[in-house]
């Protein structure tokens, strides 16, 4: 196998493990929020609502960050595949934007 094939196989395996890790983190975050919600239900109504809002904000932040991480990984993999095939996407974008 060529060096490019080994690199691509490594990137695909790394991407799969990365996505699995992010899914595991989101699952753990969901479990923590569910446990926190169960404990907060025993407290007063006002503090429960405040804590639920805070938990929702944290969930949204985690999802946005995980989406950014996954997007960056996928973008890097696609850029590497294009580079391996001789397509320089950054040069094409620069030429399209600046007209050079």
UniProtKB/Swiss-Prot annotation:
Gene Ontology CC terms, in alphabetical order: plasma membrane
Chief place of localization: membrane
Recorded topology in the membrane: Multi-pass membrane protein
Highest taxon listed in the record's lineage: Archaea
Subcellular location: Cell membrane
Keywords tagged on the record: Cell membrane, Membrane, Transmembrane, Transmembrane helix
Transmembrane portions of the chain: 7-28, 38-60, 65-87
Protein known as: Uncharacterized protein AF_1283
Organism, scientific name: Archaeoglobus fulgidus (strain ATCC 49558 / DSM 4304 / JCM 9628 / NBRC 100126 / VC-16)
